[in-house]
């Protein structure tokens, strides 16, 4: 194993560790907070988190073993199962992000009718459709024997070893990426650009009110005026940064892998195996970044994390006080005798 392989193996180990911790923390927050569970987006987040954990436990370790051993890391049946999960979880992850963007679009653009438009029943229906959509492709690939170990990505994933099926496999793979990656990307762009438009409109209204107030307050201190103007500038940039993060992480993580798969199908030029594994690692890194992008940085999840930490530390302090009290009583008893 050369330095490239060692670096890729280290990247996979780090991704597995971060993904387990962050997604596990999101799951604990969902179990702990009834307020979060009552909201429709909790179903999308739960679906995304469980998929990320399953990918972290099954697919990432097999890819790590494939990178280290430079060969198929498991038997044919286990590899086909892992390839089925890899295809299903990739599509499910992308479509779940699209569902979350639709939820935020409805919440921002139609705030008064949001509760009527996005109930838990509606969210459950969207999750069910996501599963059905995502299951279609791996089930088809399983029926056509297009699941197995792919040496270029050191992973159990979509692959076809028969030259006479090259065209059919290329059409199938293109349809899979078009109806998962491209469809989700279009939905993300449409919904978040609508959200950005509404956010900028509200910022303009607030800016007008702020400027009118500053004009009326003649005796206001210059430092207060500067703080108001700085807050106005931050308000304009906040929505743009968030939306850029949502769309940017989606592209950075998934686009290299999707483009590599398509180039592999329609080009005769050889692709370096290290790049293939790196593109797969980038796709896996989405599982590690999703909890921070969609959950843990939000106020409700931060509050739930604080409550969990306080509960843990309070139990420890009570336990330590109890032990101290017991030892103190044991020291006193012999004296009283």
From Swiss-Prot:
<feature type="topological domain" description="Cytoplasmic">
    <location>
        <begin position="103"/>
        <end position="123"/>
    </location>
</feature>
<feature type="topological domain" description="Extracellular">
    <location>
        <begin position="145"/>
        <end position="168"/>
    </location>
</feature>
<feature type="disulfide bond">
    <location>
        <begin position="79"/>
        <end position="156"/>
    </location>
</feature>
<feature type="transmembrane region" description="Helical; Name=5">
    <location>
        <begin position="169"/>
        <end position="189"/>
    </location>
</feature>
<keyword id="KW-0472">Membrane</keyword>
<dbReference type="InterPro" id="IPR051880">
    <property type="entry name" value="GPC_Orphan_Receptors"/>
</dbReference>
<protein>
    <recommendedName>
        <fullName>G-protein coupled receptor 26</fullName>
    </recommendedName>
</protein>
<keyword id="KW-0812">Transmembrane</keyword>
<dbReference type="InterPro" id="IPR000276">
    <property type="entry name" value="GPCR_Rhodpsn"/>
</dbReference>
<comment type="similarity">
    <text>Belongs to the G-protein coupled receptor 1 family.</text>
</comment>
<feature type="topological domain" description="Extracellular">
    <location>
        <begin position="267"/>
        <end position="276"/>
    </location>
</feature>
<feature type="transmembrane region" description="Helical; Name=4">
    <location>
        <begin position="124"/>
        <end position="144"/>
    </location>
</feature>
<feature type="topological domain" description="Cytoplasmic">
    <location>
        <begin position="298"/>
        <end position="337"/>
    </location>
</feature>
<feature type="transmembrane region" description="Helical; Name=7">
    <location>
        <begin position="277"/>
        <end position="297"/>
    </location>
</feature>
<comment type="function">
    <text>Orphan receptor. Displays a significant level of constitutive activity. Its effect is mediated by G(s)-alpha protein that stimulate adenylate cyclase, resulting in an elevation of intracellular cAMP.</text>
</comment>
<dbReference type="Pfam" id="PF00001">
    <property type="entry name" value="7tm_1"/>
</dbReference>
<keyword id="KW-0297">G-protein coupled receptor</keyword>
<keyword id="KW-1133">Transmembrane helix</keyword>
<feature type="topological domain" description="Cytoplasmic">
    <location>
        <begin position="32"/>
        <end position="47"/>
    </location>
</feature>
<feature type="topological domain" description="Extracellular">
    <location>
        <begin position="1"/>
        <end position="10"/>
    </location>
</feature>
<dbReference type="InterPro" id="IPR049579">
    <property type="entry name" value="GPR26/78-like"/>
</dbReference>
<feature type="transmembrane region" description="Helical; Name=2">
    <location>
        <begin position="48"/>
        <end position="68"/>
    </location>
</feature>
<feature type="topological domain" description="Extracellular">
    <location>
        <begin position="69"/>
        <end position="81"/>
    </location>
</feature>
<dbReference type="InterPro" id="IPR017452">
    <property type="entry name" value="GPCR_Rhodpsn_7TM"/>
</dbReference>
<keyword id="KW-1003">Cell membrane</keyword>
<keyword id="KW-0675">Receptor</keyword>
<dbReference type="GO" id="GO:0005886">
    <property type="term" value="C:plasma membrane"/>
</dbReference>
<feature type="transmembrane region" description="Helical; Name=6">
    <location>
        <begin position="246"/>
        <end position="266"/>
    </location>
</feature>
<dbReference type="GO" id="GO:0007189">
    <property type="term" value="P:adenylate cyclase-activating G protein-coupled receptor signaling pathway"/>
</dbReference>
<feature type="transmembrane region" description="Helical; Name=3">
    <location>
        <begin position="82"/>
        <end position="102"/>
    </location>
</feature>
<feature type="transmembrane region" description="Helical; Name=1">
    <location>
        <begin position="11"/>
        <end position="31"/>
    </location>
</feature>
<feature type="topological domain" description="Cytoplasmic">
    <location>
        <begin position="190"/>
        <end position="245"/>
    </location>
</feature>
<dbReference type="GO" id="GO:0004930">
    <property type="term" value="F:G protein-coupled receptor activity"/>
</dbReference>
<keyword id="KW-1015">Disulfide bond</keyword>
<keyword id="KW-0807">Transducer</keyword>
């Amino acid at each position: 194993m050369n330095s490239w392989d060692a670096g890729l193996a280290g990247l996979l180990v780090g991704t597995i560790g971060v993904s387990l911790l962050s997604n596990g923390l999101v799951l604990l927050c969902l179990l702990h907070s009834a307020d979060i569970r009552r909201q429709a987006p909790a179903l999308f987040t739960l679906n995304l988190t469980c998929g990320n954990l399953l990918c972290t436990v099954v697919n990432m370790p097999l890819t790590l073993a494939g990178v280290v051993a430079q060969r198929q890391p498991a038997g044919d049946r286990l590899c086909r199962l892992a390839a089925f999960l890899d295809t299903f979880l990739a599509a499910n992850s992308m479509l779940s992000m699209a569902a979350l963007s639709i939820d935020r679009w409805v919440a921002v653009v139609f705030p008064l009718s949001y509760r009527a438009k996005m109930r838990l029943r509606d969210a459950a229906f969207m999750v069910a459709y996501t599963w059905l959509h995502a299951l279609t492709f791996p089930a088809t690939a399983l029926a056509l024997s297009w699941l197995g170990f792919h040496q270029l990505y050191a992973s159990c994933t979509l692959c076809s070893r028969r030259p006479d099926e090259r065209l059919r496999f290329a059409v199938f793979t293109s349809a899979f990426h078009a109806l998962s990656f491209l469809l989700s990307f279009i939905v993300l762009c449409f919904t978040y650009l609508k959200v950005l438009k509404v956010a900028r409109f509200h910022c303009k209204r607030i800016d007008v009110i702020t400027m009118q107030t500053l004009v009326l307050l003649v005796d206001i201190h210059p430092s207060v005026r500067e703080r108001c103007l700085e807050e106005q500038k931050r308000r304009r940039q906040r929505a743009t940064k968030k939306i850029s993060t949502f769309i940017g992480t989606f592209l950075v993580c998934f686009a290299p892998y999707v483009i590599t798969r398509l180039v592999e199908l329609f080009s005769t030029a050889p692709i370096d195996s290290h790049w293939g594994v790196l593109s797969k690692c980038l796709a896996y890194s989405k599982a590690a970044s999703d909890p921070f992008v969609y959950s843990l940085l939000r106020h409700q999840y931060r509050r739930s994390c604080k409550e969990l930490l306080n509960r843990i530390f309070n139990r420890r302090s009570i336990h330590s006080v109890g032990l101290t009290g017991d030892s103190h009583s044991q020291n006193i008893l012999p004296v009283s005798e």
